[in-house]
From Swiss-Prot:
GO biological process: protoporphyrinogen IX biosynthetic process
Keywords, in A-Z order: Cytoplasm, Isomerase, Porphyrin biosynthesis, Pyridoxal phosphate
E.C. numbers: 5.4.3.8
Family, as annotated: Belongs to the class-III pyridoxal-phosphate-dependent aminotransferase family. HemL subfamily.
Keyword field contains tRNA processing: no
Protein name (record): Glutamate-1-semialdehyde 2,1-aminomutase 2
Lineage, top ranks: Bacteria, Bacillati, Bacillota, Bacilli, Bacillales
Length: 427
């Protein structure tokens, strides 16, 4: 398997874009391998410009829950393109997707479409602050909510720490209103509210953390957040940009039975096109302009192509789709445990719906500190060997793998065999 064309393309790209990429993880730095340039894809398969074929578990980092180039989605997109790409005015496609989102997401009575997950979380925080009249937000260590200034912060030391900037260019004055605590730690939340409760506007949380690998909530964690925010008059914000429609038919909140005040969506609701959304109770959402005075706007928000792709994607998902994901996940988990045991390599597997995370340590993995104990050198080796076997995994230990309705049981069996072959060359 060669990467000659990708290597040459990257040399050109590095003179055109920072690091040659438009999103850092695509540089493949953490796995010490050439960045791969993709050419086309269909179903569960993706092909690079060197002609290499892979079973794809990245799926554009989650959006493609139906697999690549779904016929119904592509057909309707062609029809939408022929009508025009953007109008700067409302379209019926916006109504259709909004109705479907409201129907399926328990917390959402009204929704505002945007063009990215970062936009959605940024707007949700502004709305939470405007609605409550408070300043501080709680987030969790290892949870990623986009690249807005107030969320790019470190945890520091201690149980509940006022944030310091985690990226140059983020003013300390901005970061100081973000409190970071360990994921799955209700005691830390209680301490934070005891110290700052009268100025905490809300908690933003991934109901299943997806950017430190896949880390589900402990029993009672999400319910505890709901109770504490209720007690203090703060808002509970679920960032379901990744988990939305991946963990369950009614998103993670439906799966776990905990209803937040606001929900952020993205990825799947665009079916592979740029999209985001935030929504919640009517009384909160009616504070957003033009009804209320909390401003948010976007030139391409609700554009007809993304709305069409999202509607056609969600329309094909049924409760049976999630039963299928469970079946595939069971086969993959059982197979991986057998293979890793055979080679005496420790593995911890975490799952939630169509999201699967594996950590090369003894486990358990319930927070960012435990995720960081994974064997990153072995992960890097394994990534390279799996690519040779025709399996495209996320090039980072701290990203989850994704299943689609296009994946077959044969794909899963081939993947398990690929892990066996890869490990036999490494250990």
């Amino acid at each position: 398997m060669g990467y000659e064309k990708s290597i040459e393309a990257m040399k050109i790209a590095e003179n055109l874009m920072p690091g040659g990429v438009n999103s850092p993880v695509r540089a493949f730095k953490s796995v010490d391998t050439p960045a791969i340039f993709m050419d086309h894809a269909k179903g569960s398969r993706i092909y690079d410009i060197d002609g290499n074929e892979y079973i794809d578990y990245v799926l554009s980092w989650g959006p493609l829950i139906l697999g690549h180039k779904n016929e119904q989605v592509i057909k309707k997109l062609h029809e939408a393109v022929n009508r025009g790409t953007s109008f700067g005015a409302s379209t019926l496609e916006e109504n259709k997707l909004a109705e479907l989102v409201i129907e399926r997401v328990p917390s959402i009575e009204k929704v505002r479409m945007v063009s990215s997950g970062t936009e959605a979380t940024l707007a949700a925080l502004r709305l939470a602050r405007g609605y409550t009249g408070r300043n501080k937000i709680i987030k969790f260590e290892g949870c990623y909510h986009g690249h807005s200034d107030s969320l790019l912060i470190k945890a520091g030391s201690g149980v509940a720490t006022l944030g310091l900037p985690d990226s140059p260019g983020v003013p300390e004055g901005t970061a100081k209103n973000t409190i970071t605590v360990p994921y799955n730690d209700l005691e830390a939340i209680k301490i934070a509210f005891e110290n700052y409760g009268d100025d905490i506007a809300g908690i933003i949380v991934e109901p299943v953390a997806g950017n430190m690998g896949v880390v589900p909530p402990k029993d009672g964690f999400l319910q505890g957040l709901r109770e504490i925010t209720n007690d203090y008059g703060a808002l509970l914000i679920f960032d379901e940009v990744m988990t939305g429609f991946r963990v369950g038919y009614n998103c993670a909140q439906g799966y776990f039975g905990v209803t937040p005040d606001l929900t952020c969506l993205g990825k799947v609701i665009g079916g592979g096109l740029p999209v985001g959304a935030f929504g919640g109770r009517k009384e909160i959402m009616d504070k957003v302009a033009p009804v209320g005075n909390i401003y948010q706007a976007g030139t391409l928000s609700g554009n007809p192509l993304a709305m069409t792709s999202g509607y056609e994607t969600l329309s094909q998902l049924t409760p049976e789709s999630y039963e299928y994901f469970q079946e595939l996940g069971d086969i993959l988990e059982e197979g991986l445990k057998k293979v890793f045991s055979k080679h005496n390599v420790p593995i911890t597997i975490n799952r939630a719906g169509s999201m699967i995370g594996y950590f090369l340590n003894e486990g358990p993995v319930t927070n960012f500190e435990e995720a960081n104990k994974s064997n990153l050198e072995l992960f890097s080796q394994m990534y390279r060997e799996m690519a040779k076997e025709g399996v495209f995994l996320p090039p980072s230990q701290f990203e989850g793998t994704f299943l689609s309705t296009a994946h077959s049981k044969e794909d899963i069996e081939k993947t398990i065999q690929a892990f066996d072959t890869a490990l036999s060359r490494i250990v």
